Structures are given as C-alpha cells and as structure tokens.
C-alpha cells in the first residue's frame, strides 16, 4: 500500500504557538471498559478536530494520538503489532542515560491559539480521564523566531514536503500499518544560566551552527562532539532522517527551562540510533541538559483508528 498523506495523523513539523503534550497510564482495572472508551475515542478524535477547526477558523490545529507497546498488547492482544514498536527500556550513555518512563497513551496537540489547544485536550480528556492517570502534562510555546529555548533556530535540517513523508511515515515495509508513525517523546531540562554564560562562539562550536544567521559551521570549526555531528544517523554513508520538533517549555518562577523533544519517524531504529550516538558520544549539549523522560509510541493511521473504533483489532 502506498503512503496516503490524507490518512496520516499530524506527524509533521508544525510546532504551533501553543502546544500540549500529555502522556497517560491506563488504570488497568477493567480492560473491556477501558477498550470501549479507547474505541469511542478513536471514533471521535477526528470529529473533535473538525469541529474545533471550524469554530476556530483553522488556527493551525494538529493532533497526534498514540499507544505504547504495553498499551497495544493490553488493549489489542490478538492484533498484529507494528514491526518496530517495542517496550522502550532506555539507552545507556557515557555520562548520562536516556531514561525510560512508563506510559500507555500519548497526546500531542498544537495550534496557534492557546484556547484552541486547551479546548481540544479538554474534550479528549473528558473521555480518557476516567480510565487513566496522568504521567506528564507539558505546555509548550513558540519561542522567538522559531528558536529552541537555547536560542538557536530549531529544525533547519528537518525533511520537508515529500521528504518529510518518506522519513516520517511508515510505508509498505509494514503494510498493515502504512501511514502510521513512531513517536519518541523526551523531556529535557536545561541549565540555561551555565549555557548563556558561554561565549557565543563556544555555543556555536557545540551546536555546529551560527547562532544568529543559522549558517552551518565548517566541519573543522565544530567541536568533535557538536550536537549536529553526533546526533546524526549516517549508516551506510547515507543520512537517515526523522521529523523532529524541539518545543520550549518553562516554569520561570521555579527556574525550570526545558525542551520537549518529539521525533516522528518511519523507522524507530533511526531515532534510536541518533539517541544512542548522542549519549554514547557525549553530545556537548548534554553538558547543559538533563533528560527527564523517554517514551516510545505508535501513532496509528486514520484507517487503523477506524479499525480500532469498529472493534476490528
């Protein structure tokens, strides 16, 4: 089956002005009752999007909803499993590890109006709240000029247009789950005081790009462990990509400043390789960043959501 972008969820780079990431655990008290709610949610989620989009005159609304491996096995024990959906166990690094945080359900809502984001999440949670508990809820925002909270432009090397589809959406290599995607969600907190104390030239060496012009440095200008050096997957002399967003979040009164990384990928193995390289090759950005969470989810296609709604999985 060929990829049909009209049948994918919103797994492309459209960070939005207002962002909500919510991860949930199922109560696991009554599987049949919980499955019924999930089936209802799968049926309603696109209707909620259409309704709110009409009332809000668009506002750039995007929604992605997905399942962890444990949730998939619990809810759909007799169904086939997406080929690369695994129970994420974390990644061992040299100085820091990628933590694995238990979660069953993933919700990523973004729009250009905070009231729209709130309305969508609130309506979805009306259904999910009785059968779940919240693992994490993070509210992100659009930072100046589309920059990450570390003040560098975000996503310059992201695949775009057809290339984004090729790297972000499952194809015919897994025909039962074509048009789906693998989402890796990871929350970081930064020591921005220490980061901002660095000279701009040092920050640029550690990132691999100019801070203000966003021009990539020459290889000999970069630190050997620069972020845009070690965070790549260049196996077989080919650059493998994902669709990534680094969404700023903060509680300034508490001194908390961070990034919520979300990577949508056709191949989870690509994201995993990038993370492994970062943490085993001591990405310089990690000297100023602490990983808080790590979670892998499968984002079903609209056809798979329809099958869930109809009880066909």
Q: Where is each model-derived feature located?
A:
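Long, histidine/aromatic-enriched segments associated with O2/redox biology
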Residues: 1-313
């Amino acid at each position: 089956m060929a990829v049909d972008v009209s049948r994918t969820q919103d797994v492309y780079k459209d960070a939005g002005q207002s962002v909500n990431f919510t991860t949930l655990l199922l109560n696991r008290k009554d599987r049949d009752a919980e499955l019924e709610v999930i089936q209802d949610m799968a049926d309603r989620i696109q209707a909620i999007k259409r309704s709110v989009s009409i009332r809000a005159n668009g506002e750039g609304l995007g929604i992605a909803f997905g399942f962890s491996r444990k949730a998939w096995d619990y809810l759909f024990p007799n169904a086939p499993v997406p080929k690369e959906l695994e129970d994420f166990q974390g990644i061992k690094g040299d100085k820091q590890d990628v933590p694995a945080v238990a979660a069953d359900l993933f919700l990523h809502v973004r729009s250009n109006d905070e009231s729209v984001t709130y309305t969508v999440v609130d309506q979805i949670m009306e259904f999910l709240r009785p059968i779940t508990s919240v693992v994490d809820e993070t509210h992100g925002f659009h930072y100046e000029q589309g920059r990450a909270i570390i003040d560098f432009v975000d996503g310059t090397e992201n695949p775009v247009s057809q290339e984004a589809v090729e790297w972000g959406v499952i194809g015919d290599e897994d025909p039962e789950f074509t048009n789906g995607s693998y989402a890796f969600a990871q929350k970081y907190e930064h020591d921005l005081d220490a980061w901002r104390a660095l000279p701009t030239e040092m920050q640029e060496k550690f990132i691999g790009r100019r801070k203000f012009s966003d021009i990539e440095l020459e290889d000999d200008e970069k630190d050997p462990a620069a972020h845009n050096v070690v965070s790549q997957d260049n196996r077989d002399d080919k650059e493998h990509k994902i669709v990534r967003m680094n969404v700023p979040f903060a509680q300034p009164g508490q001194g908390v400043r961070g990034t919520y990384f979300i990577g949508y990928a056709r191949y989870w193995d690509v994201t995993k390789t990038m993370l492994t390289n970062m943490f085993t090759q001591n990405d310089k950005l990690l000297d100023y960043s602490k990983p808080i969470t790590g979670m892998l989810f499968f984002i079903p296609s609209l056809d798979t959501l329809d099958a869930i709604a109809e009880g066909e999985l």
